[in-house]
From Swiss-Prot:
Location(s) in or outside the cell: Spore core
Protein name: Small, acid-soluble spore protein P
Signal peptide: none
Annotated region described as Disordered, given as residue ranges: 1-44
Keywords: Sporulation
Length: 44
């Protein structure tokens, strides 16, 4: 029973932790993309 609980806890933590970092990475990527696009426009 302890093994199942540990596995369940680990899966729940991984599932909950996956969407959080993905969202953060997306936000940073989006910001970087916007900045790079602006820079390219300026160069032009």
């Amino acid at each position: 029973m302890s093994h199942t609980m540990g596995k369940n806890n680990r899966e729940a933590k991984e599932k909950k932790g996956q969407p959080e970092p993905l969202s953060g990475s997306h936000k940073v990527k989006n910001r970087n993309h916007s900045r790079q696009k602006h820079h390219a426009h300026h160069d032009m």
